[in-house]
Design a protein with these regions (language model features):
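Predominantly soluble domains enriched in secretory-pathway, periplasmic, or organellar proteins
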Residues: 1-190
């Protein structure tokens, strides 16, 4: 109804997957409207994209202990974040800016490089091939709503210095989900 008001939360729930059934063991306060989450391969660092706070939360992971250790301001709304396989960089989907940003990761220190790549309209998701050579973005096209038009997946060359967009592939309307297979030879976009 007309009295409904959208109020973004700031909670991240920590789930213990070793119990049967899995159980919530902690709640960590991050930025407003946590949207995308990525954990590095070492399992000791997580990044959270906070849409309503225009920031990335940096969390340390030690066993079952998860702590907020830093917040990186991004200057605009971010929808998703993903580590590169080597854990030295992360890519950030800057949803309304139609860009992918690059973060440097040095241990637990995360910094915005200020390098942005123009991709298709409204990038909502980003993933990296297992070898770290390419990244793909799901370019939603219309701020989350279907508009009946085809949209794109942008292809980013991560081996270039600096990384750059090298292609766009036309896909169906309003892609949000995107994943790359463990071998890196297939991608699924929904």
């Amino acid at each position: 109804g007309e009295n409904w008001k959208d109020v973004p939360d700031n909670k991240l729930f920590v789930i213990d997957l070793t119990t049967n059934p899995p159980a919530q063991i902690a709640t960590v306060e991050v930025g407003k409207q946590p949207s995308g989450l990525s954990i590095n391969k070492a399992g000791n660092l997580a990044l959270v994209a906070n849409r309503a706070d225009n920031s990335i939360s940096v969390l340390s992971i030690s066993g079952k202990d998860v702590k907020l250790i830093d917040t990186v301001p991004m200057g605009e709304q971010v929808a998703h974040v993903v580590f590169t396989p080597d854990g030295k960089r992360a890519l950030v989907a800057k949803f309304p800016g139609h860009k992918i940003g690059v973060l440097d990761v040095d241990g637990q220190k995360v910094t915005d490089t200020k390098h942005n790549m123009n991709v298709g309209l409204w990038p909502y998701n980003v993933d990296v091939t297992p070898n770290g050579a390419l990244a793909l973005t799901a370019d939603n096209g219309n701020s989350g709503a279907s508009d009946g038009n085809v949209d794109t997946v942008s292809v980013i060359d991560l081996e270039a210095t600096p990384p750059r967009v090298i292609d766009r592939v036309v896909v169906g309307d309003a892609p949000e989900g995107l994943t790359i297979s463990p071998k890196g030879n297939l991608a699924a976009v929904v």
